[in-house]
């Protein structure tokens, strides 16, 4: 018995040492930070699914208001959380090269070849090839298609609001974003079965799992052992979807001017030259297989569908709470549409300046992109400090913390679109607003997301008003199981005909 007790004690001691061996790292370097907990570091609440990870980082941001750089532990791995905006400006822009990688790579066979998760030369090459798909010129051709999807969505809204005016707004606008992404990105006109299939995929893509924590404990292990952060069913679906779409198109263009037309042109090239540091460098080109294209289609869908749906959920919620802002927005929509014969065009959206401010303020208060993560490719001393981040370590920028900091946004809980009038923008630090990150690794689909949301908002508010619901009158309790931050149980509003 004594032998067993001794063995258990020794094993417990070894495990404790192993999972706390790095916890004096920042203390030795005189870098302030929260006290880590064995095994979990500073992420106990998110690892145990008590809070979303983004809210854990916001809490750390709030806890150290006088620090430029905060030393944290993502599980057992030393990392930093940046608070100083001048330092933050260096990371994605001025000193981009040392921080070009996100550090969230995983198996290329598990959709890891997508442009968001790819790092290094692979990311550069994909970015160069796929950026032209999101130019203003390309997106302008999609606006009529977005408008058609919006008209169908209004018919759906009519049906559901007649049955019950009180609606889970997230569930409702998801119908628009799924249908719009399917039309604009895949050239598909969804039937009810396909819509249901895509809705069922939601839980596999946007429910958090423990692969992230595992990769923090052992950085790079997912890529090394061909692991993925998504279940096989997701890859199988997008592989089949890609194959079916290209077989259906048979190399011909559609009359819709969707994204598949542009992807087909890339597909015919067979390969993409990887980025070279030197002209004479011998680098094997990236083969544009259907698997690589499938990974891009997956990320276009995942990023374009759920982030927009979540943003619109908060936008309509705030309009319901602030009827004066809603009145002003409706007046602008009515006036501008009357000048354009009721048609939504590029010029029409450009004239809706207050709509743009409402969009920006929504993402200020609720930055669904959550936080920025970058992996150091070299040792780097943060400007204005003597703090060094080592090669392979991770930096975190709490977008939610910055954009809800009263230092930059007085009374941050107030929803105030005038924070984004030209004068206020001019007087604010550029890194005080980072919903799409910044620099070369910012969100590639920024314009698409904005236009998608604006088209839907214009369609809805030209016919309806949104009013508060008693179901969503209290303080939000965010769902720790959701990848993008949403309250448990959703957000409800009443949709009322004007």
Swiss-Prot record:
<dbReference type="InterPro" id="IPR001128">
    <property type="entry name" value="Cyt_P450"/>
</dbReference>
<dbReference type="InterPro" id="IPR002401">
    <property type="entry name" value="Cyt_P450_E_grp-I"/>
</dbReference>
<feature type="binding site" description="axial binding residue">
    <location>
        <position position="443"/>
    </location>
    <ligand>
        <name>heme</name>
    </ligand>
</feature>
<dbReference type="GO" id="GO:0005506">
    <property type="term" value="F:iron ion binding"/>
</dbReference>
<dbReference type="Pfam" id="PF00067">
    <property type="entry name" value="p450"/>
</dbReference>
<keyword id="KW-0492">Microsome</keyword>
<dbReference type="InterPro" id="IPR050476">
    <property type="entry name" value="Insect_CytP450_Detox"/>
</dbReference>
<keyword id="KW-0479">Metal-binding</keyword>
<dbReference type="GO" id="GO:0016712">
    <property type="term" value="F:oxidoreductase activity, acting on paired donors, with incorporation or reduction of molecular oxygen, reduced flavin or flavoprotein as one donor, and incorporation of one atom of oxygen"/>
</dbReference>
<keyword id="KW-0256">Endoplasmic reticulum</keyword>
<dbReference type="GO" id="GO:0005789">
    <property type="term" value="C:endoplasmic reticulum membrane"/>
</dbReference>
<keyword id="KW-0408">Iron</keyword>
<keyword id="KW-0560">Oxidoreductase</keyword>
<protein>
    <recommendedName>
        <fullName>Cytochrome P450 6B3</fullName>
        <ecNumber>1.14.14.1</ecNumber>
    </recommendedName>
</protein>
<keyword id="KW-0349">Heme</keyword>
<comment type="similarity">
    <text>Belongs to the cytochrome P450 family.</text>
</comment>
<comment type="function">
    <text>Enables the insect to feed on furanocoumarin-producing plants and evolved as an adaptation for detoxification of xanthotoxin and other furanocoumarins.</text>
</comment>
<dbReference type="GO" id="GO:0020037">
    <property type="term" value="F:heme binding"/>
</dbReference>
<keyword id="KW-0472">Membrane</keyword>
<dbReference type="InterPro" id="IPR017972">
    <property type="entry name" value="Cyt_P450_CS"/>
</dbReference>
<dbReference type="InterPro" id="IPR036396">
    <property type="entry name" value="Cyt_P450_sf"/>
</dbReference>
<keyword id="KW-0503">Monooxygenase</keyword>
